[in-house]
Amino acid sequence: MPMISVLGKMFLWQREGPGGRWTCQTSRRVSSDPAWAVEWIELPRGLSLSSLGSARTLRGWSRSSRPSSVDSQDLPEVNVGDTVAMLPKSRRALTIQEIAALARSSLHGISQVVKDHVTKPTAMAQGRVAHLIEWKGWSKPSDSPAALESAFSSYSDLSEGEQEARFAAGVAEQFAIAEAKLRAWSSVDGEDSTDDSYDEDFAGGMDTDMAGQLPLGPHLQDLFTGHRFSRPVRQGSVEPESDCSQTVSPDTLCSSLCSLEDGLLGSPARLASQLLGDELLLAKLPPSRESAFRSLGPLEAQDSLYNSPLTESCLSPAEEEPAPCKDCQPLCPPLTGSWERQRQASDLASSGVVSLDEDEAEPEEQ
């Protein structure tokens, strides 16, 4: 019959018939001084290690049990058939979810330990992080290996706080460089510049190009440099409109046009026919609108000089000068912002379609 001596007590294992359950009973006290180790264990046939664990758990039960003076026959029997229930939670069979969670936590812990104790110190010691952050001169020649080694060693010699501060300073500097590049690109694209400054730059560049490419006559050169068109200004509500633009005689126009190349603006006969066609259009207009269109007559005559879009684009309000032309004198100072209205009126007059909505709206505003 198997017997186990644990904590100074003898445990008697009995089996209830063939194939029955194993029961354990305490018999007598072996010694007055309890021993905390298993003296000897004799397992019956077919008894698994789980039963051994159950026997070990009897250690605490035997100490908290009844006094040893009580006879073993008076003690209740302990059922050890359900060994899993007697095991502690850490020794029970784990489910697949618990095993997966344990594996994940173990893997995470291992990877974190490797990062903290292997990867991070190695990278800091070699200066890779500092080198990537502080390397700003892409176009500069690379330093010698000795210089790089000295930089790496100096970085690794710093304390952890100094390394973090240096790292943060490098990141902030990279952000500042990126922001400066974005501002430079936006200024190159013209997003920050106003329309007026853009027109001034464009007009100045076109004037230099036209002066070097086109063989202009003396009168047209004066027109390009010191001459501007302006809208007529009303002197009063009763008085008729007075033309403030410069009046150019037909002889001056012909002499200026003949100095240009034939391929640029066409033959003088074609321009003369356009001028005559405009005069015929003036005669056919009703009397109520004739006075308004007469004010546009010099404008359309001057606009025939600039049939080419290239020459029209050369004129902008940025080039306005008070010096008059040598063939004509201004009658009144030009108005600010009148260039767009004059261009619209001259385009309408040259195309043969007159829109007097703006001229009719001016008396209402005054």
UniProtKB/Swiss-Prot annotation:
This is Protein FAM131A. PANTHER family: PROTEIN FAM131A, PROTEIN FAM131B-RELATED. Residues 356-366 have a biased composition (Acidic residues). Belongs to the FAM131 family. Residues 342-366 are annotated as: Disordered.
